[in-house]
Amino acid sequence: LGQHFLKDLKVAQDIADTVDVCPEIPILEVGPGMGVLTQFLLPKERNVKVVELDYESVAYLREAYPQLEDNIIEDDFLKMNLQRLFGGQAFVLTGNYPYNISSQIFFKMLEYKDLIPCCTGMIQKEVAERIAAGPGSKTYGILSVLIQAWYKVEYLFTVHEHVFNPPPKVKSAVICMMRNETHNLGCDEKLFKQVVKTTF
C-alpha cells in the first residue's frame, strides 16, 4: 500500500479474521509493516511468520512483538522459496499487500498453489474486482482467468479511504481465495498461461 497506514483497528481485526476459513494451518503474512494486522493474527495461536523487506519495519516488529523474533523473515517475498517456509506444510497467505506488487504476489501464489489452500487480504479495489470478475464482465481479464482456474474467489468487503493515514486516492477491498478441486487443467500450464496472456 506504500506509505498509507491502516489506522482503523476494527478493519484490521476483520482482515485478520479472514484466515479463519482455513483453521489450524500456519499463517504467512506478507508486508506486515508496523504490525497492524500482525497484532490480530498472533492471538490465533497458530504458527505465524511474517515477510518484510523494509529494514526499519523489521526493527520495529522485533521490538514490538518479541514473540515473533524467530518468525520474522527479512526478505523479498517475490524471490523466496516458499517450499521451505513451514517444512513443506500448507499455509494461509495473508496481508495488507503492497498495491504496486499485488498482481505479482498472486502470480507467486499460483506457483505454489498446492502449498497455499487459502489466500486472503487487502488489495486495491479495482484489482479485487478484476480477480473476482466473471466471464463476460468488463473487468474480466488475465488475473480473473488464471486465479479462478485454481481458486474460488470471494470479494468480501470494501475498505474506504478514510481508514488510512494519509487517505489514499483509491478504495481498497478484502478478498478470499480458496483452492478449488482442480488438480490438472488437461493441458500444459505454461501454455495455458501464455494463451490467456495473448488472449487479453
Model-predicted regions and their roles:
Residues L1-T198:
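Catalytic cores of RNA-modifying enzymes
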